[in-house]
Amino acid sequence: MPYQYHIQSNDDLVTPYQEVRAGFVALALERNRKATPFVEQARALKIRVSQIERPQDLLQMRDIRPTLLAASGVSDKAAGHLQEQDKVDAIEGLIQNFLEPAGENFVEELVYRFLLTRGDTLGGSMRNVGGILAERKFARYIISALTLSNTSYKWLDKNSKTWLNQPDDDTDIELRLRGLSWNLEGRNRTFIYNVNVPIVRKNIDICLFDCRQNEIEKNIISNPNIYIALGELKGGIDPAGADEHWKTANSALARIRTAFDRHSLKPYTFFVGSAIEKSMAEEIWHQLNSGILTNAANLTQPDQVASLCAWFIQL
């Protein structure tokens, strides 16, 4: 029972209050980090337009048209579908409805409108920030486990979508990492985040495959025999949403077991979560003791995650 190395009771799985508080602070810091480019753009916009005397002059400033469109409430995606005249109409609407009524304060109003739209953009990107931070943290623990066992690895860059060799300096590698591949004691293993598993017909947070990284392709992913372990990773820290996160994860794990059982297969299943309440912990503990769930860990507890990742790379 691999979970017994780091969990002795259901109470061990419950997220302590101080970790909830630390989690909210981490989310706030990430929001500020992501907001910084928008704030700097707003400052640059204010300096750029401070030289004009009236809002209508903005129509002649073609170099900042994308920014003016953003201030008009047009998203980057929507702008790609608009004709040139549509863009002009949107900016004229901004000028007539908001900037001209602001009088001599039209520059401040323009900056405000820009930040308002970018705030919505930021809000959308922040909806899954807990999940993104969780992926980074989990990846760092896997890398640490591999390093500790003196196992070299390749990593999948989510930006270039290419597999790269282990770097000499792996600082912040988790910011761009989508997967890892290694060979330990003659076993080729590759793990990837967010895989749409064909036989489950659902996107699964973590999948561990019995293959090299260069063998990962659609045909391989469709082969149920290639799966070693599948797990759900929930990084949301808000206790109010903890139960819903577990319900979603538990449903996905149940679908995994049912789908693979049809092929007489039983891959390992595990759950890692940041916000785990008492009732959730009791249910997870029951599933572990019953053999329904193979392993679990609270993401806010370093020893638990380190233990689970040490188990993970040995599979």
Swiss-Prot record:
Name the record gives this protein: Type II restriction enzyme AvaI
GO biological process: DNA restriction-modification system
Catalytic activity reported: Endonucleolytic cleavage of DNA to give specific double-stranded fragments with terminal 5'-phosphates
Entry GO MF terms: DNA binding; type II site-specific deoxyribonuclease activity
Main EC class the enzyme belongs to: hydrolase
InterPro entries attached to this UniProt entry: Restr_endonucII_AvaI/BsoBI_hel, Restrct_endonuc-II-like, Restrct_endonuc_II_AvaI/BsoBI
CDD domains: BsoBI-like
Gene: avaIR
UniProt keyword annotations, A-Z: Endonuclease, Hydrolase, Nuclease, Restriction system
Pfam families per the UniProt record, alphabetical: Endonuc-BsobI (PF09194)
E.C. no: 3.1.21.4
